[in-house]
Amino acid sequence: MIYEFASAENIGDRKEQQDRVVVMSHPTAADVVLAVLTDGMGGHTGGALAAQSVIDAVVPMFEAFTPAAGAADDWLRAMIMAANDKVAAAGKGYNRDPRATCVLALAQPGRINWAHCGDSRLYLFRDGEFASRTEDHSLVEILLQQGKITEAEVDTHPERSKLFTSLGGAEPPQIATGCIEKCRPQDTVLLASDGLWAYFQAREMADLIGYRNLTAGCDRLIGLARKRASGNGDNLSIAMIRASAPIKRGLIGTLFRSRLVEPSPLEDARRFMLNYLRAISGPVADDLTLRIEACKSGAELSAQFPGAAEAVEGQGGAAQATFFVQRVKELLEEA
């Protein structure tokens, strides 16, 4: 198994870029890849200093990592603890109070281990669908786990940015770890800062990256997040790693060409609408699904839009319908 990877970042509408992201293969093992994404916390002084300190601590440790030695979880924990110490030391040296969040993914043949602290997230997409994500170290995540708010309310909750752990503080950081075992071809992990994930539901992310090469997927998500921020967006950063079957001799040209073929905006809109309707099911949704599958133009798809929006509102409520309408309008405008 081999891994493709890509990353991107954007300053958003802030004066300073306080996110950092690095994705790299191991210097002695091309099939071992590390992604590290860190977000310097804007509520403290020295956010950019904190984020850069994380990178400065983690990258040399990865370069010294021996893939065959030790448990990956232990290595990732050690990397985050080293980053924590470096952030704290940087604060003392510059008389500041830097803090940062961090998420790491370590891909080795057949598995991907991850670790995180704070609200920078890792998502897993499998078979073109959202499978799981890390749980934020935040008050809002606790409310979600207690059933007091919904997943859709997390992104816009007024307390969303309140974390109970981070790197660089007086207390040792809380670190969560996990492993995606028996990776399948096309399994994709996506790392994102809150400046990016706040603008998307996980199901929409799956639609946007499922049939794209990784660089195009990163660019598309950042572009849409910037559009939705309407001039008041945070720093954004994203990294992706995708598992691929080894390329056989003679198939390289075909595979390379196929990865360059991007779906049209019309196909994006069709797939987005179909995914929503299949999720709610029922006679009305099933009939709309057949109609949308038969659409061959933007005009035909637009004609089915009002009925689809009504069906989504009937099953998912006003909040889901509002999101559905906004996203479909964006896609149809592009088509």
Feature locations, PLM:
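Long, compositionally biased terminal regions
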Residues: 245-335
